[in-house]
């Protein structure tokens, strides 16, 4: 399986990952947690935590979200009950969408 190079991500994506990593580091230090404490609590390696805090885009999103939650960062600006309600709303919308998207066929006008 080919690995995606960081250079293929948009600038805003790279900035968002960097910002989230810095916010995680600030929250961790604010709670007086070492990288070892947080990585143990999240069930990840110290190296992975360090990559998350640097904004590495190759980190698993589940690990990033878990670390952010442990240090108290609020994800999606919602509490758990409203997040569950928003998931239900998204499921309802997805149910109304077509299961498959077929590209529209271009009709070539070759009548000169």
Spell out what each predicted region is.
Residues 2-29:
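A short, Lys/Arg-rich alpha-helix, primarily the initiator
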Residues 22, 32-33, 59:
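Residue-level signal for the short linker/turn that defines the boundary of a DNA-recognition helix
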Residues 24, 35, 64:
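Generic structural marker for isolated residues within well-ordered, non-membrane alpha-helices
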Residues 29, 40, 69:
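Short polybasic/polar patches that bind polyanions
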Residues 32-48:
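Short alpha-helical DNA-recognition segment
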Residues 60-78:
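DNA major-groove recognition helix of helix-turn-helix/homeodomain DNA-binding modules
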Residues 78-112:
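Short, charged recognition helix plus adjacent turn
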